[in-house]
Structures are given as structure tokens and as C-alpha cells.
Curated annotation (Swiss-Prot):
Heterotetramer of two alpha chains and two beta chains. Red blood cells. Involved in oxygen transport from gills to the various peripheral tissues. This is Hemoglobin subunit beta. PANTHER family: HEMOGLOBIN FAMILY MEMBER, HEMOGLOBIN SUBUNIT BETA-1-RELATED. Pfam families: Globin. Heme b binds at residues 63, 92. Disulfide bonds: none annotated. The gene is hbb. Gene3D superfamilies: Globins (1.10.490.10). Belongs to the globin family. Transmembrane segments: none annotated. It comes from Electrophorus electricus.
Length: 147
């Protein structure tokens, strides 16, 4: 997946309108609520037994910020996303044994969270297309060690 210069600009612009402290926790909470089987990777987070518990869980919020921090690295390295995520891919594959399809689910959850935050005027079809291509590259990079 190759981002055009216009799409790269759209990603950088989009990124400037997001707050990691807000969007990360929302996206991870959405993942855990919408796809409850993903909760098995977060047993150490304590109570994640309901939507309210997930939304109020400080460990979910903290890890959501970590996820957005990792995405920030990709935004800053748009020319080398695979290289940027090489070590993280190895950790998720060999140590954490995360099903790589969960990266796609998190990308979907992140996209919905961004769309809700920015609304139709801030998240138009062109921006969505750029974000989809960017996140597809991220998902591919995170799954690289599984192949």
C-alpha cells in the first residue's frame, strides 16, 4: 500500500487534530466492547466485564495512549512503517501471541473513534481513504513477523 503525497499530508493533518489522551483510550475501549473476545489479551487489566467497566478502567486508558504513541511513530516515519514496527511485531507475535487479525479490528475501532471525534466535515471520504491506507500499512507491518 503506497500513500500518495496528498494522502501523507492528509494523515499528518488528521494527526494534528487528535488528542492521544482522548482517542487512544476511546479506540481501545471500543475494541474491547465491540469485539469482546479480544479481552483475553488484557486479563491483567482487572475489571473489563462490562462496557462501563472498560470505559472507566485506567489500565485500558493507559494502554490506549500507548497504542496511539505507537501510531504516532508511524506517522513520523511514513516512509518506513514496516521498519518502525519490526520490534513491536516480534513482541506481539513471539511473546504476546496476539492473533494478527486483532490489529485489523483495532484499526476499525480507531477509524470509528476518529470519525466520531471529527464529524463529517473533519472526516470526509478522502481523509477516510488516506487513514484506511495508512492503517492497512500499520496492520501489515504489525503482522509481518507472523509470516
Amino acid at each position: 500500500v503506497e500513500l500518495t503525497e496528498a494522502q501523507r499530508g492528509a494523515i499528518v493533518n488528521l494527526w494534528g487534530h487528535l488528542s492521544p489522551d482522548e482517542i487512544g483510550p476511546q479506540a481501545l475501549a471500543r475494541l474491547l466492547i465491540v469485539y469482546p473476545w479480544t479481552q483475553r489479551y488484557f486479563a491483567s487489566f482487572g475489571n473489563i466485564s462490562s462496557a462501563a467497566a472498560i470505559m472507566g478502567n485506567p489500565k485500558v486508558a493507559a494502554h490506549g495512549k500507548v497504542v496511539v504513541g505507537a501510531l504516532d511513530k508511524a506517522v513520523k516515519n511514513l516512509n518506513n512503517i514496516k521498519g518502525t514496527y519490526a520490534a513491536l511485531s516480534t513482541i506481539h507475535s513471539e511473546k504476546l501471541h496476539v492473533d494478527p487479525d486483532n490489529f485489523r479490528l483495532l484499526a476499525e475501532s480507531f477509524t470509528v473513534s476518529v470519525a466520531m471525534k471529527l464529524g463529517p466535515s473533519g472526516f470526509n471520504a478522502e481523509t477516510q481513504h488516506a487513514l484506511a491506507k495508512f492503517l492497512a500499512e500499520v496492520v501489515s507491518a504489525l503482522g509481518k513477523q507472523y509470516h
